[in-house]
Design a protein with these regions (language model features):
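Short, structured motif recognition centered on aromatic/hydrophobic residues
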Residues: 15-26, 61-72, 76-92, 176, ...
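Flexible internal linker/loop segments at domain or repeat junctions
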Residues: 237, 241-254, 284-288, 321, ...
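Conserved amphipathic alpha-helical segments that form helical-bundle/coiled-coil interaction surfaces
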Residues: 37-91, 125-137, 279-336, 373, ...
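Helix-turn-helix/homeodomain-like alpha-helical modules used for DNA recognition
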Residues: 6-54, 124-135, 249-289, 370-372, ...
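Short helix-adjacent coil turns
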Residues: 34-37, 49-56, 73-75, 104-126, ...
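General nucleic-acid-binding
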Residues: 10-14, 43-47, 61-65, 70-82, ...
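C-terminal all-alpha effector/ligand-binding and dimerization domain
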Residues: 96-158, 162-163, 336-409
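Short linear motifs at protein or domain termini
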Residues: 1-21, 151-260
Length: 409
């Protein structure tokens, strides 16, 4: 305990706000998904919260809230929220009286929230009540944290959110396959050199050699000594390649998790992002969408343009890092064979219409409508991607390989 330090007030304020923007909507969603026996575990956790044992009491409180986030079965969201530093925080402005009151609030919360008649609005109200009984609502929050805690250092890197056991080289060759499938590289085109690929993907020469070797074995590229790497004159179609189902399924899973995170959190995030937007910036967003429409460009798509705009405008560094990671992960779409080429034109038009509607609201100074429309647009996109993945039989593959209910059961 003597290793513990005071948090940095600036980093802490930033992360508390980020935690609210992520946890609040995810808790609400997790609660709304709970049915019948799902409630047994949270009930058991509250029952063993002893106000006389401070450390254990707060440990159980953290497990209680983690359960509802895990109930959403989104591993990316669970990892991100878990990495914000609250797990290791030791609460100081804490009395037995406060613990008794907080436990009472939790008992009331569980009793009310598990009623079948409990609506989304009821859940939000209940969450707000519990929040006011918790130490997080006490200002200033007195606590100590480990020396390397994000509550001291802030969050800049997203390394820990992206670690998966997937081979690095598969990421490189799937990306190249995707770029060929969307026409970025055509037959006979020269690909970047190994040195350039290493820089582009942040990998070693061993990784790029392995990736190019795989593409060569499949007849996708040819290498000419002293000249470089070229796309073959007759590269096979993506559906004829012996791609590992497990690998493609892992990308589908992460891609879906990214968009679900947007669908769940975008309303709160967009509302805060919009607060500092100048009329000129709002107009510029509208113009960017208009130019995309006029030139008939497909990349970046309208939803990605809105996401880029949010990343620029989010006032909290940690939240900005989260959305920047989601933006980076959008490139995954080209690693999933058939996903880009199977776009439904009518649905793409509807997505674009919704993006323009959101931008119009912002240009008109209505930040609440902007936030609402942005969230609805990402929810629509998320549903559209689920349908596409289902049509391509990817959902079945993901379910066969990953039992996401293990996150909470």
């Amino acid at each position: 305990a003597d290793q513990m330090k005071d948090p940095n007030p600036v980093a802490m304020a930033d992360i508390i706000k980020t935690e609210e923007l992520l946890s609040f909507p995810y808790n609400a969603r997790g609660i709304s998904l709970c049915r019948g026996t799902d409630w047994l575990l949270p009930q058991r956790i509250v029952a063993q919260m002893d106000p006389e044992q401070s450390d254990l009491f707060w440990q159980n409180s953290k497990s209680f809230w983690r359960f509802f986030i895990a109930r959403c079965e989104n591993e990316l969201a669970l990892r991100i929220i878990g990495s914000l530093g609250f797990v290791d925080l030791k609460n100081l402005n804490d009395s037995e009286q406060m613990r008794i009151a907080y436990r009472e609030a939790l008992l009331h919360f569980v009793k009310e929230a598990e009623q079948a008649s409990c609506t989304g609005e009821d859940i939000e109200k209940l969450l707000t009540e519990v929040y006011h009984a918790s130490p997080l609502s006490k200002s200033p929050l007195e606590c100590v944290v480990p020396p390397d805690s994000p509550l001291r250092l802030g969050i800049h890197s997203n390394e820990q959110w992206l670690k998966t056991a997937e081979e690095r080289y598969s990421s490189v060759y799937l990306d190249i396959l995707g770029l060929i499938s969307i026409g970025r590289y055509r037959q006979g085109d020269q690909l970047p050199s190994h040195a350039a690929l290493q820089l582009q993907y942040g990998v070693s020469v061993v990784t790029t050699l392995q990736a190019v070797k795989t593409l060569k074995q499949w007849g996708v590229v040819e290498t000419i000594r002293g000249k470089g790497i070229f796309v073959s004159q007759h590269p096979p179609a993506a559906d004829q390649l012996p791609l590992s189902q497990k690998m493609v399924a892992s990308y589908v899973k992460r891609y879906l998790e990214n968009f679900e995170l947007l669908a769940v959190t975008a309303e709160g995030v967009a509302l805060y992002a919009a607060q500092s937007v100048s009329p000129a910036q709002a107009q510029a967003l509208r113009q960017t969408l208009f130019d995309t429409e006029r030139t008939g460009r497909r990349y970046p798509s309208y939803p990605i343009t809105i996401l880029e705009f949010l990343v620029e405008q989010i006032p909290y560094k940690a939240m900005q890092a989260v959305y920047a990671t989601v933006l980076e992960n959008q490139r995954m779409v080209i690693k999933i064979p058939g996903l880009v080429s199977s776009e439904n034109p009518a649905q793409v038009l509807e997505m674009n219409r919704r993006c323009i509607g959101a931008a119009d609201a912002l240009a008109g100074g209505d930040t609440v409508a902007f936030a609402k429309r942005t969230a609805e647009m990402f929810q629509y996109v998320y549903q559209h991607i689920i349908e596409q993945c289902d049509r391509l039989h990817y959902l079945h593959a993901v379910k066969g390989l990953y039992d996401t209910s293990l996150l909470w059961k």
